[in-house]
Regions:
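Conserved "HGTGT" condensation-loop signature of ketosynthase/thiolase-family condensing enzymes
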Residues: 1-74, 78-108, 112, 116-120, ...
Length: 201
């Protein structure tokens, strides 16, 4: 199992504008797949996020309300499939690409999906990605309405690569981390820290 994280300093990705969401995903996955290259035809990628790319959605909505010309790049990147498509091209990944949303901790949902995908004998490994942006007024209100953990304190993405023969990791309760530190990424951040050998985020 390989793990990597990306934070607010993630470098930009050509063709993606304004939002940190896609650069975060790209950097975390790039770090994993560079450290652990493999057969892209037998690799799946699964991305999970509670709020998705709220920056792009909010910016596009504000421009629409203001009567401004719509930016086609914002339309293109408004779904998380866009950055998965970019990564599949960069790393020749031709297996399934999936995007999920859950209001609970993302780790359990991603690991359950990985187990299901690896029942397919044509797949050998799965790249798991969790990503959340720091809260805005709108998303913080949405988290309250959903009665879920809430947004992370800063933009963050976590990626793991799990091979078929790896012992499948299991999340465990975080080490007293304040809920606002990592939001719905808490389980993934703690799991990545264990895999990296630091045992603490």
């Amino acid at each position: 199992v390989i793990a990597a994280m990306a934070g607010p300093a993630a470098p930009p990705v050509a063709g993606f504008v304004e939002s940190a969401f896609n650069p975060l995903v790209h950097q975390a996955v790039e770090r994993c797949l560079t450290a652990h290259p493999g057969d892209g035809s037998r690799t799946a990628m699964v991305l999970a996020s509670t709020m998705g790319d709220a920056t792009t959605l909010d910016l596009g909505s504000r421009r629409l309300v203001a009567g401004q010309v719509h930016n086609p790049l914002l339309f293109m990147q408004s779904t998380a499939n866009a950055i998965l498509g970019q990564l599949s091209r960069d790393f020749a990944v031709t297996g399934p690409l999936l995007c999920l949303s859950t209001v609970a901790d993302l780790a359990g949902e991603l690991l359950s999906t990985t187990e299901l995908l690896l029942t397919d004998k044509e797949l050998d490994r799965v790249v798991l990605i969790g990503v959340e942006l720091a809260g805005t007024g709108r998303t913080t209100a949405a988290y309250r309405e959903l009665r879920t953990i809430g947004p992370p304190a800063e933009d963050r993405a976590v990626a793991l690569v799990i091979d078929r023969d790896d012992p499948h990791p299991h999340p465990r309760p975080p080490y007293g981390t304040p809920p606002t530190a990592y939001g719905t990424l808490r389980g993934l951040v703690e799991l990545a820290a264990r895999i990296q050998g630091t045992d603490r985020p």
